[in-house]
């Protein structure tokens, strides 16, 4: 990422929605807060050649926030603090809505990105998950997310941002990387995304291969029961909140509103030890799984695995 030590990342601010707040990392803190990939990335950067042992970290991401709210509430914080790095992953809650103007979202994003880049802030973007890995009910969102992602790549190239390609990280589609709601990452998923983000910032490239989703082996009856349970426990409450005009994060404050030393972040023991499983190892495992399937048999899985995400890609 940098050529000189003076350009190392010494301050990092995460903004966005539930993804960057850290839901549903099972390694929750005692006060109920989640750890998440941005906490893990901040800690990892204290031991990275592009980071600093004394790196300071703040997190203003709040669950349920749509893009307009993030731009109105969180981007001004970034412009005020002027951190070395901002991770800005947003728009997922907007794209889920039928009336969304995807081109309009891109225009909003560009204004926010331009403002931060004009202040010399490095920006790490993340694109949308492949919703074909969601429930069949949400598979129809895939074209909309794909258009949004195309805009994201354009913005990254246009403004010199780093891109965390969450769409293309096919190893992340495995069920163990997702929470039961099929929308948020598990602890393993957050670890993998943090590792990939670090790889991007360090200027390395990991060859995540493949395009198809892993074929499910569950019987049809089990898949139908799993779908019904998900609709009742997760989708119905979400729709109810939308109809009432409420948000799960309506009354929440930022997790880390002020700077905290990233080296002292409370992470679980496996995270403290560093990269326990490399992105390349994840890809190798995915290749082994794919080798057992005949070409062309891959299809959408039905386990708790939301839109897949993609691994690192170089800065554009």
What kind of feature is each model-predicted range?
Residues 133-167, 187:
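Substrate-gating cap/lid alpha-helix
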Residues 15-16, 126, 216:
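Short hydrophobic segments within beta-strands
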Residues 26-32, 100-103, 138-142, 179-180:
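Short glycine-enriched, charge-decorated loop/helix-capping segments at active-site entrances
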Residues 21-25, 51-53, 67-104, 130-131:
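Oxyanion-hole/transition-state-stabilizing segment in secreted/luminal serine hydrolases
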Residues 118-123, 161:
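A short helix->loop->beta-strand "cap" motif at the edges of active sites that frequently abuts
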Residues 102-110, 142-149:
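Charged helix-capping and loop-helix junction motifs
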Residues 1-63, 75-82, 280, 286-288, ...:
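Serine-esterase "nucleophile elbow" of acetyl-processing enzymes
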């Amino acid at each position: 990422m940098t050529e000189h030590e003076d350009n190392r990342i010494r301050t990092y601010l995460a903004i966005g929605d539930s993804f960057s707040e850290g839901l549903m990392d099972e390694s929750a803190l005692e006060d109920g807060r989640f750890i998440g990939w941005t906490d893990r990335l901040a800690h990892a950067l204290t031991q990275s050649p592009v980071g600093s042992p004394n790196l300071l970290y703040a997190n203003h991401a709040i669950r349920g926030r749509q893009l307009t709210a993030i731009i109105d509430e969180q981007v001004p914080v970034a412009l005020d603090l002027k951190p070395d790095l901002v991770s800005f992953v947003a728009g997922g809650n907007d794209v889920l809505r039928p009336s969304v103007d995807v081109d309009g979202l891109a225009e909003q994003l560009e204004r926010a990105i331009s403002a931060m880049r004009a202040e010399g802030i490095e920006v790490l973007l993340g694109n949308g998950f492949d919703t074909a890995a969601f429930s069949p009910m949400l598979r129809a969102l895939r074209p909309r997310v794909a258009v949004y992602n195309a805009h994201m790549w354009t913005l990254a190239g246009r403004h010199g941002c780093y891109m965390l390609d969450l769409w293309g990280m096919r190893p992340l589609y495995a069920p163990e990387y997702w929470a039961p709601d099929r929308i948020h990452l598990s602890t393993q998923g957050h670890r993998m995304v943090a590792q990939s983000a670090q790889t991007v910032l360090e200027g390395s490239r990991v060859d995540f291969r493949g395009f198809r989703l892993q074929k499910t082996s569950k019987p049809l009856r089990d898949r139908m029961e799993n779908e019904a349970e998900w609709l009742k426990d997760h989708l119905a409450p979400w729709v109810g909140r939308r109809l009432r005009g409420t948000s799960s994060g309506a009354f929440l404050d930022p997790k880390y509103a002020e700077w905290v030393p990233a080296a002292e972040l409370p992470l679980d023991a496996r995270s403290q030890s560093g990269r326990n499983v490399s992105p390349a190892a994840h890809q190798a495992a995915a290749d082994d799984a794919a080798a057992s399937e005949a070409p062309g048999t891959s299809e959408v899985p039905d386990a708790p695995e939301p839109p897949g995400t993609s691994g690192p890609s170089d800065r554009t």
